[in-house]
From Swiss-Prot:
It is found in: Membrane. Residues 567-581 have a biased composition (Low complexity). GO terms for biological process: G protein-coupled receptor signaling pathway; response to pheromone. GO terms for cellular component: membrane. Residues 669-679 have a biased composition (Basic and acidic residues). Residues 505-604, 662-684 are annotated as: Disordered. The chain crosses the membrane at residues 9-29, 189-209, 221-241, 255-275, 296-316, 332-352, 363-383, 395-415. Keywords: Glycoprotein, Membrane, Transmembrane, Transmembrane helix. It comes from Mus musculus. InterPro entries: GPR180-like_N, GPR180/TMEM145, GPR180/TMEM145_TM. This is Transmembrane protein 145. Glycans are attached at N35, N250, N458. It holds the Pfam family TMEM145_N.
Amino acid sequence: MEPSRAPVLGRLLPPLLLLLLPLYPRTRAKYVRGNLSSKEDWVFLTRFCFLSDYGRLDFRFRYPEAKCCQNILLYFDDPSQWPAVYKARDKDCLAKESVIRPENNQVINLTTQYAWSGCQVVSEEGTRYLSCSSGRSFRSVRERWWYIALSKCGGDGLQLEYEMVLTNGKSFWTRHFSADEFGILETDVTFLLIFTLIFVLSCYFGYLLKGRQLLHTTYKMFMAAAGVEVLSLLFFCIYWGQYATDGIGNGSVKILAKLLFSSSFLIFLLTLILLGKGFTVTRGRISHSGSVKLSVYMTLYTLTHVVLLIYEAEFFDPGQVLYTYESPAGYGLIGLQVAAYVWFCYAVLVSLRHYPEKQPFYVPFFAAYTLWFFAVPVMALIANFGIPKWAREKIVNGIQLGIHLYAHGVFLIMTRPSAANKNFPYHVRTSQIASAGVPGPGGSQSADKAFPQHVYGNVTFISDSVPNFTELFSIPPPTSSAGKQVEETAVAAAVAPRGRVVTMAEPGAASPPPPARFSKAVHSGWDGPTPSYQPLVPPEQRRGKPASPNTSACTQPGALHPRSEHPFPASAPRAAHRAPAGLRNPVSLPAQGLGHARHPAPLPHPAPTLDALRPAPFPLVPNGPAGAVLRVPSLSPCPEWLRNLDSRCSVISAPLTPFETSDPAGLRNTRDDRLDPARPSRTLRPSSHCLETDIVKLVSTLKPSLGFVTSDLCFVRPSECQGPSHGLWQKDVFSSCQNKEDSLSF
């Protein structure tokens, strides 16, 4: 499901690293040591940018006395000095020496006649050598580049062993650093800490996104770019720290740091292009042609970066102060950057055209990274032509790191998983990634290749430890452009429709008899089915018994049918009964309804009495396969620990023994449990005064006769429960009256 992420980076990096590590030129270190032998009469040695007052050169030269006499020439960066003589083919050795001002002590004569040179003759194995050890301080009106050359005009060539230490003051932060490198170590350490913080925050945000199944490939690539950036800065700090100590440093470490820096840039650039094309935002896969284009482009960009590093190490003239982009490879990188921006613009515009609802993300995303795309080439051009050479490296280093920090910081802010973040790009889970292809005919993407537009709408970020119930009840609107979803979890396609209870019997078991018809003796207009159950308590036991605290709703005098708003007339003897004073008051229900907002008009004919509605007994049939008892969710406000489809409504006539109940307010009778043949054993229920009834069977009894269906009736208001508070249990009791979707539909 993921595009090819420039595989050349992983395959080419190790061999390129081995190729580039030996290329670092040793002559650029500020501790310069070497053995020169040349047939020329004028040779460049090294350069250094000294401070205005604290620059110093300490040297030790040694050459055969037969090669006498040689001179050390000190040029500075004035146009009449070094630029006038370096690579000037029309000037010979004497002409190059003529631009030197002797009054400025710019010539060190390596002979015994020149006292300031510190030369003396030594003999080794029969050969006489001139050994010169001394130093020179540099003062100027500003920081200047100084260039050191060796000359012997009219001679037979040059031969010299040299060792030079060029310093700026005695501080650890300045001693071995050239003036144009001041502050680089401090800047790198500061940005290392900042990028480490960004990387840690990105890992934390990635952890949150993973918990919500929103950790997509593009965010992983951003995390990888930030991590590689941290490694790059770490190696830069190691190099500059060692350089500050001995003035040499480790060139291989610097090359490795540059490779990591370029890799971080390439990964982030690829991330931006992929996001512009809508990968993981509006599509789950880049088309084959798009993957090929990305692979070719990233391969070309990678090779250009490698060529730039090789060119800088091998072909940059140490006699000139050059910036990285002052080369054909550098200008090629600028061109590739501009091409990447054009591609980025086209991809973002296409994504916005097909998915306009993603404007809150793409508009600021496009505006922010337009500045970033232009910052790199503009910085290169300004560095090449607008920044003085004696301050270029430290300024460019700070600007370059600032550009990288801007890019990573903006991305981190725009993709933070916060409810207040209106620019969050991801709305499809990682477990619902769909294939996405190229736009179809007419520029529209095919329906089976793109993400459904806002499958989840606006993502609500809540605590990971709390389930997000809002998503359980949110149903996406049907759309013809919805892509094929691939779910990691089992799809609940075989589950019965919500709110419908499906019961099945074992094959071969006895089927329930057809519903009987009520006799029309009570009223000529009444005709309805006989309920599919028999009351457990005989009529003679129900009459004349006081109501217990757990009296069921369907046996109370004058109580409403649980699924009907029409009261049944109660007989006079039953209406006259009252609860004993020692027991709690039974639940009383209003005759007009159960707190429901809607009251349909009463039936045009009177309702029959309970005695007239009582059907003839017939065999009971279990509700589950092989006689098993099915558990169904209780719809009454008072939860039951065991509620079955064949539970009965009964009248409790006698108290229980103390050990059978834990209710401190009263005892409960379990006669209904003992008389229930379908209940395997007596099960204690939590004591409550709320109404309990078998809604499923009672509604199946009266539904055809009453001619209406109540699908979202909530039976009891919380105020009607008179039982004591039971903490969290009481919270669950009233939760069933708060969501209409929790009720059954018949």
